[in-house]
Amino acid sequence: MKQICCTILLFFAFAGSHAQDFADYFQNKTLRVDYIFTGNAERQNIYLDELSQLPSWAGRQHHLSELPLEGNGQIIVKDLATQQTIYKTSFSSLFHEWLSTDEAKETAKGFENTFLLPFPKQPAEVEISLYSPRKEVMARYKHLVRPDDILIHQRGMSHVTPHRYLLRNGNEKDCIDVAILAEGYTDKEMDLFYQDAESACESLFSHEPFRSMKDKFNIVAVASPSTDSGVSVPRENQWKQTAVHSHFDTFYSDRYLTTSRIKSIHNALAGIPYEHIIILANTDVYGGGGIYNSYTLTTAHHPMFKPVVVHEFGHSFAGLADEYFYENDTMTDTYPLDVEPWEQNISTRVDFSSKWEDLLPAGTPIPTPANKWEKFPIGLYEGGGYSAKGIYRPAHNCRMKTNEYKEFCPVCQRAIRRIIEFYVP
């Protein structure tokens, strides 16, 4: 297995060295693409909403036609004239999660989704695909982008939201740019927001591998003001006017704090270089969520704020799965047991060799008994991805399993490190 891993790494090094040059195909600007994902549990569709141009590109300028993770959706950009693939990215969405709910069996809905792509120099074809938990195509949509289109909305040239850098290690093209956005903070509460953003930053960089790779990041706190203080709690009939319209009770789950108004997030960030997003909610009620390559959203004043913001960023930044599970429950709608999940920290053993098999010490029992966790810090422990049976995690405990544990397990640390190195070699 070690030989296979070395071969894979050499392949990526070779591919990267012979990949197209960013400047051959792209301007130093961002193409923001807004979509609407619609449908129900039976049928899904994708519709183009709007195209926008942002003043600069903060994303990667290498590994352009490669994916770090499969995700639940993918975007492929091709040069229209040559049909050469010039950019790829992957993602997950709140829409994907909603499709597994009872509500999706009874009604159809639409969800906003926004993605950032490098702005092409020449006409390009964009293809976006949504995948089921079985990795089958649910919906696919193609459209053209003509860079001289006068209806591409120019954003971020003025009326930029006030912001302050908490960490700046270099130009946006040389670092991973994370924006921390205020939600439920009034103009008079922005000093509190900046303090909370500092706390989130401090917590993130107290965890490996973020701590040792801190110089790869820029962190900017964005003071997006809300009319009302706090966030909406529908079960208590509290609806507030806030910057990104977040609320608890997502999918009727008390603690699930999200927003479906994705465009409001990106509108608040227009004109500020960013790739990844953390939203801090001005409330002491426990809750939050993290969606791969979409956003992290968490409450800022609950005692568990610091571990939760790191856990949720593990989802949104590195595509890590939840390692906790419910006794006597198997959620096969989320993770079918005959399909290997794309997340790097759980396995159904369908393709365990693609996960952390190479990290197991010789003699590690497969599966690893729960009472042997002290002897085997890395193993194959049953229970993860919300299911007590059939899904396995790498360690007895981890930041992706409980709030009380102090760090990411070695497998999650490697997964995060690989993502960082993919973005910033």
Go through each PLM region and give its residues.
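Bacterial Sec-dependent N-terminal signal peptides
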Residues: 1-23
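Beta-strand-enriched, solvent-exposed domains that form extended recognition/catalytic surfaces
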Residues: 25-152
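Fold-level signature of zinc-dependent metallopeptidase catalytic domains
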Residues: 150-211, 221-231, 250
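Short pre-active-site segment immediately N-terminal to the catalytic Zn-binding motif
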Residues: 190-193, 288-312
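Catalytic Zn2+-binding segment of zinc metalloproteases
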Residues: 313-329
